[in-house]
Amino acid sequence: MEAERRPAPGSPSEGLFADGHLILWTLCSVLLPVFITFWCSLQRSRRQLHRRDIFRKSKHGWRDTDLFSQPTYCCVCAQHILQGAFCDCCGLRVDEGCLRKADKRFQCKEIMLKNDTKVLDAMPHHWIRGNVPLCSYCMVCKQQCGCQPKLCDYRCIWCQKTVHDECMKNSLKNEKCDFGEFKNLIIPPSYLTSINQMRKDKKTDYEVLASKLGKQWTPLIILANSRSGTNMGEGLLGEFRILLNPVQVFDVTKTPPIKALQLCTLLPYYSARVLVCGGDGTVGWVLDAVDDMKIKGQEKYIPQVAVLPLGTGNDLSNTLGWGTGYAGEIPVAQVLRNVMEADGIKLDRWKVQVTNKGYYNLRKPKEFTMNNYFSVGPDALMALNFHAHREKAPSLFSSRILNKAVYLFYGTKDCLVQECKDLNKKVELELDGERVALPSLEGIIVLNIGYWGGGCRLWEGMGDETYPLARHDDGLLEVVGVYGSFHCAQIQVKLANPFRIGQAHTVRLILKCSMMPMQVDGEPWAQGPCTVTITHKTHAMMLYFSGEQTDDDISSTSDQEDIKATE
């Protein structure tokens, strides 16, 4: 009977049965990975929400990481971990399961003390165990720390000193912290506590408190753009918080410079320094905020400004000796050392006023503040095309090399098209009120600093001609002309000299007809008939680091000194 019920071999019903099995197994093989992937993503989302809830309520500055950059052990369970979370203020590292325990067990850096503490009263060390920096040495026995493959040894989160487990005695646990190598840059929590108490008592004599910290105390404020340098600023914020007081470190995308700089008003007169981590645009934003402090009558609190260049361009930072771009080639601790060694100098800032023709003077002139340069012509056209495409697809322009390749493409295109030709027929140029006759040019560039176009010394050119001395603090502008994009490229590789038009205290340019590309400090726009007037606005107090001086800087300085001697 059973044999009768079975389908005969080769019958249609047996084929259908086999096809059903095949379809079932195919569906399982397709749907099972989909189900597993969906389940894993759901669990991952739940875990992320759980972590975010802990992060939001925590006093630590927790951040996720998928892979620690060095051998790491959980500070709670002491197990070796590859991924987890770390605090970017105190450096604590834990796995995901120990987050809540770490939050309750360990205290983060306190930006100010809870009790009323005098500045003269030193703080005790704040030790955390394990994960000491590589190549660190014990402050007691001077031997290397962190050599054992386990959670061992201690680090003070303020002075960054390390000590072995066996060297950690009761006397050392109670030892006072001197804030280490960067004590002259750190704002002590006890200082802020005393300031807070003085403000309650309606006292403002902060100089008395500061004098107890020493004349060498020049507290540093970090203003970093987390979006600059392919989001490199985000990581720098955490590294600076570990080395300094977290209250000194600001993300300008969340706290505008005008608000962040109010911290300077709690510091001694003329003592504060600011390190701007970002491109030339971020530096200009900070300097505008400094000008607002002058308007408010806060001149005595104005800081000196240093630059850590991120992104592309960075001609101002190059002029001030900070290099063309930071990509982590030196540790952040060395950056702080460079800031301590830097010298104060002045930087001219200029007002660029653009008055459109027509409109019966009903429109207000557009005003810009210039730190680097103003230009009309092919370089402004390249910047305009680049910015237009970057706004459409910003994710495609996250690489410095790619950005420079795009600039090269537009420069090559303009060599063939020559959209800015016959500029001399479209504009009139006046230097200090005197009209200047122009040859057949495609571009005019007005310089305040030595570098232009991502590292080119435009005013110097090939260096084989005598030229007047150029400085960024003499109240003079250098005006040059270029014959086209190909001429710009030749100047950048020192195969040609620019057409030096002259130097002036005031520059006036009249665009008589047609639309032309213009830019101020790398911010381009298309401009119709107008009058552009450039006059001196103010000085900015900057920090110059001579340690980054290049061979070009040395040769340029020596050449100009020789010229000055012959004159």
UniProtKB/Swiss-Prot annotation:
Key words of the record: ATP-binding, Cytoplasm, Disease variant, Hemolytic uremic syndrome, Kinase, Lipid metabolism, Membrane, Metal-binding, Nucleotide-binding, Repeat, Transferase, Transmembrane, Transmembrane helix, Zinc, Zinc-finger
All residue ranges annotated as the DAGKc domain in the record: 215-356
GO biological process terms held by the UniProt record: diacylglycerol metabolic process; glycerolipid metabolic process; intracellular signal transduction; lipid phosphorylation; modulation of chemical synaptic transmission; phosphatidic acid biosynthetic process; phosphatidylinositol biosynthetic process; phospholipase C-activating G protein-coupled receptor signaling pathway
Name of this chain's protein: Diacylglycerol kinase epsilon
GO cellular component: cytoplasm; cytosol; glutamatergic synapse; membrane; nucleoplasm; plasma membrane
Membrane-spanning residues: 22-42
Record-level Gene Ontology MF annotations: ATP binding; ATP-dependent diacylglycerol kinase activity; kinase activity; zinc ion binding
Gene transcribed to yield this protein: DGKE
